[in-house]
């Protein structure tokens, strides 16, 4: 029984997350294990400490809440930031905003070009250019990635009376 329990603890069941942010489609996601992160994967991830602190302080996201973002670049990719634009070979250029919606300056994590190291990825929102993502806090360690995020939809809950009325 101890061995079975240990195996269960080491391989947790997929998680269910609700995303209320416009940085990814609003709704429910199941989070599945992810062995290798590839460009284009939608993932649930914790933010690096400095980014989590800033996001929490500014009210973007409570501390400890995961984000859902797209893997934009992986280890070995050359990432450049120049004149307020982030570029990665094979990806469309992304503008960097100078300030957030409240007029506060956004951080710039690098100037010039750098190559992502083994175990690093860039996480970007495909949904909104105003997302707080790797454009502002830089690479994320794969150890922060919880898993692949699979969109289930925005499930609405209705009382039996509402459901019957909406069926007509």
Question: What function would you assign to each model-found segment?
Answer:
Residues 2, 6-168:
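Soluble "head" domains of membrane/secretory-pathway proteins
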């Amino acid at each position: 029984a101890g061995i079975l329990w240990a195996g269960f603890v080491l391989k947790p069941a997929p998680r269910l997350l609700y995303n209320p942010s416009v940085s990814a489609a609003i709704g429910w996601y199941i989070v599945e294990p992810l062995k290798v992160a590839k460009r284009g994967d939608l993932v649930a991830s914790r933010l690096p400490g400095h980014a989590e602190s800033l996001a929490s302080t500014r009210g973007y996201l409570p501390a400890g809440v995961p984000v859902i973002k797209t893997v934009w670049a992986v280890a070995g990719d050359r990432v450049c930031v120049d004149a307020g634009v982030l570029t990665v070979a094979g990806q469309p250029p992304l503008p960097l905003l100078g300030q957030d919606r409240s007029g506060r300056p956004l951080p710039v994590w690098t100037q010039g070009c750098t190559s992502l190291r083994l175990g690093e990825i860039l996480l970007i929102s495909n949904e909104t250019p105003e997302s707080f993502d790797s454009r502002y806090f830089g690479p994320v360690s794969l150890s922060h990635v919880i898993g692949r995020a699979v969109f289930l939809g925005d499930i609405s809950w209705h009382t039996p009376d509402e459901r019957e009325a909406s069926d007509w």
